[in-house]
Amino acid sequence: VVSCADITALAARQGLFTSDQDLYTDSRMGQLNVLTGTQGEIR
């Protein structure tokens, strides 16, 4: 029996979910940029 986690891990390893991960990362970075604004830089 193959679990959903195994399928997800395999797909992620093959790069099928890289675009989703990039979108998530970009959205997080966008939120951080909005929060910091001109007061500081993310280093």
UniProtKB/Swiss-Prot annotation:
GO terms for molecular function: lactoperoxidase activity; metal ion binding. GO terms for biological process: hydrogen peroxide catabolic process. Its cofactor is Ca(2+); heme b. Disulfide bonds: none annotated. It comes from the Eukaryota. Its EC number is 1.11.1.7. It catalyses: 2 a phenolic donor + H2O2 = 2 a phenolic radical donor + 2 H2O. Keywords: Calcium, Heme, Hydrogen peroxide, Iron, Metal-binding, Oxidoreductase, Peroxidase. Binds 2 calcium ions per subunit. Binds 1 heme b (iron(II)-protoporphyrin IX) group per subunit. Belongs to the peroxidase family. Classical plant (class III) peroxidase subfamily. Removal of H(2)O(2), oxidation of toxic reductants, biosynthesis and degradation of lignin, suberization, auxin catabolism, response to environmental stresses such as wounding, pathogen attack and oxidative stress. These functions might be dependent on each isozyme/isoform in each plant tissue. On the 2D-gel the determined pI of this protein is: 9.3, its MW is: 38249 kDa. This is Peroxidase. It comes from Cynara cardunculus var. scolymus (Globe artichoke).
